[in-house]
Amino acid sequence: MSRPIFKVHKGDRITFQQRLQDGYVCLDQFIPLLTNLSSFNFHRDDPLVENLDDMVTSQFNILIDTDRSGTRWITLQKAHELWDLLQIKDDSGSENLTDHDDDNEANHNGVEDDGQKTPENNGRKTDNHTMENGGTENTNNGNNSSNKNDGNVTAEGSNFRPATITNGTTSRISGGEPDTVKHELLDLPDSPTKRHQTKSVSKIPVFQHDLPTVSTLQKTLPPVSNYSNDERAKLETLLQRILFPETTNLNVAEGYPSVSLTQQVQELDTQFPNVPLNFNIPIDEHGNTSLHWLCSIANLDLLKQLIVFGSDRRIGDKSGESVLVKSVKSVNNYDSGTFEILLDYLYPCIVMVDDMDRTVLHHIVITSGMPGCNAAAKYYLDILMGWIVKKQSRTKESHCVLLEDIDLQWVITHLLNARDSNGDTCLNIAARLGNVAIVEALLDYGADPNIANNSGLCPVDFGAGTQPRFQSNTKNLMATPTKTHETSLDPMAESTSLITNIKSLLSKISNDYGDEIKQHNGKMKELLDTLNIKREALANARDRLAKAKQIQDEYNLLSDRLNNVENTIAEEDQNFQLASRELGLSLDDVQEEGLNSADIAFDADEPFRISYVYTKFEEKIKDEYNNDFELFLKHCNLSQLVHEIYDNFPSRAEIPHPKILKARIKAYNRNELHLDSTLQTIIPHPKILKARIKAYNRNELHLDSTLQTIKDKQKNLESKFRKVLSLCLKIDEEKVDSMLDGLLQAISNEDPEDIDTDEVNNFLESAAE
């Protein structure tokens, strides 16, 4: 959103566009005029000149801010310089919304007479979110009255403005009329500073309970950790009552409920007797205290009361961020215009740094890089520097050493060029973010663009401070030990210095890169060695795994074979029992014959075995050949062994005559007598012999039947094969048998792929004929 500014140049009326959000002026109307004024002898439409605009802006040292639509904008300060250079005057016949006509500006944008925008028609969308707490919607922009002196604040009857740097010197404000300066904090016609001017109290309140002992940069105090649950419960109950009271009475000045903290504390003392009220207890997981939250939401009324009740302003959160840092990380104080009054109560936090050694200026610059926070950050920066200047006329009766020490000289010496843990100054961060307005403001306030961070990068490397008006500062700023650098206005000297700086920077980067490459190569070598070792170990592990899998497979195979053998043995035993029953060797038959089950131990060779001879053979193999039957067959003389056994056979007198033996067997069968011991050792029991004979007969019948079945199957199969061949060869079945030998010879070969098909075909053709 922009508004017109009407100007007159050589009798012609020119309309310039000014952006409402930050007061920047569109550059497009300046380019033709500056081209005519420049030293370039080219026509604007000359095809040889493609970058004429860049050449013009470079000649006149113009920093450009390009928005998303491609429109180029410059600061209002630079626009005034160009208007003066081009001798462009205001159009007296129109209403210009410039810094010389604030009343018309207010009427044009829906601003009330007191300088504040009405909530119904405020002319802009407020981005009221915080960086940490998510933010809340705020419909009140505050109604603190503002002066109508074009941003000049009256102090002791005289107008004064914040100190700025002009032509290398510092204009210090000490109560008198200031020198003419180019960068003014409160003179932008539509700046947040003018929209949100607030009335500061004439005297800065001083609370001695938490003032820093020295006026040098120091760390914030860590969050309180030694507290009881009752203390925390009491504080949370109090915050619930004061932030969300049951009554609906609002503080008209700030838009928050008006609550008496003293009354609430008295009521809580009756509810929590003997429990002290500690306002410094953290109330969230980030270590934020009540002051942190109140600063973030811009609730000044409760903030003042908490400080009166003894809240410590030096305590930071878990990151070391002070309550003042929380206030600049939110846009609520910008929307309500309460930041200047807030500084009257939080000035001890100006000397505080967080765990990364970052000051409040660092955080203001970082906030400027957040979406929708650029204008708020610029407002915080201008108000802070303006407060530093104006407080010099307000601290005469305060009798506070800290307030007396914190002046503009102290800010430039200790705060403006302070470096964080990375070596970055606030100007270095702003230059990297590319925030032109913040960079120019910091340079005007006296920031040094040549201070390098830990990586060797300076703000100058990002284009900050390269304009001649910043390079002409060759003296110490305000007689302080702040480091300055002489810069010649000679373009050749400037180019030589810039080339030297670039060479040194490239050399340092090259050295750092070489060191990093060496370290990287060393680490890579170590990693490769480790990788090779791991690869060998992996290969060995894979080999072991393969062997283990092979052994496991073999084990599984052997287990399967063993199971198969056992199953086969069990099956054969079962079949043997069935066959034994069929052959008359079952246990039932033995029991019918009056024998025990041990008597039916089956031995197929037993009917053909002579126990005496068999015993002699066993003794011979065992005693002389150590049970090695192959060795026995190789070295033993069987004929000699047979003669020995025959010679040593028991005497024939011990064996009865065959007739006598038959008579005894008959008598034995009639149970008339028992066989003597000699016959019992030679001839089995007659019943066993009968059972065996019966079994052999049955077995022979079974074998004959099986043989006949096989023969029948074979004949049937041969008949089928003969029929198949006859059909294939197209001959009679009777001729197949006579042709089998020739056909077999034709197709027989070791390799089936090398079968001589021609020979087979010839044979088949001859057979068909």
From Swiss-Prot:
Residues 110-130 have a biased composition (Basic and acidic residues). Residues 94-202 are annotated as: Disordered. Residues 164-173 have a biased composition (Polar residues). GO terms for cellular component: MBF transcription complex; SBF transcription complex. It comes from the Eukaryota. InterPro entries: Ankyrin_rpt (IPR002110), Ankyrin_rpt-contain_sf (IPR036770), SWI6-like (IPR051642), Swi6_N (IPR040822). Gene3D superfamilies: 3.10.260.30, Ankyrin repeat-containing domain. Keywords: Activator, ANK repeat, DNA-binding, Repeat, Transcription, Transcription regulation. Pfam families: Ank, Swi6_N. The keyword Ligase does not apply. GO terms for molecular function: DNA binding; transcription coactivator activity. One of its GO terms (biological process) is positive regulation of transcription by RNA polymerase II. Residues 132-152 have a biased composition (Low complexity). ANK repeats lie at residues 286-315, 422-451. MBF contains SWI6 and MBP1; SBF contains SWI6 and SWI4. Part of a complex involved in cell-cycle-dependent transcription. SWI4 and SWI6 are required for formation of the cell-cycle box factor-DNA complex. The repeated element in the upstream region of HO (5'-CACGAAAA-3') is called the cell cycle box (CCB). This is Regulatory protein SWI6. It comes from Kluyveromyces lactis (strain ATCC 8585 / CBS 2359 / DSM 70799 / NBRC 1267 / NRRL Y-1140 / WM37) (Yeast). The lineage of its organism: Eukaryota, Fungi, Dikarya, Ascomycota, Saccharomycotina.
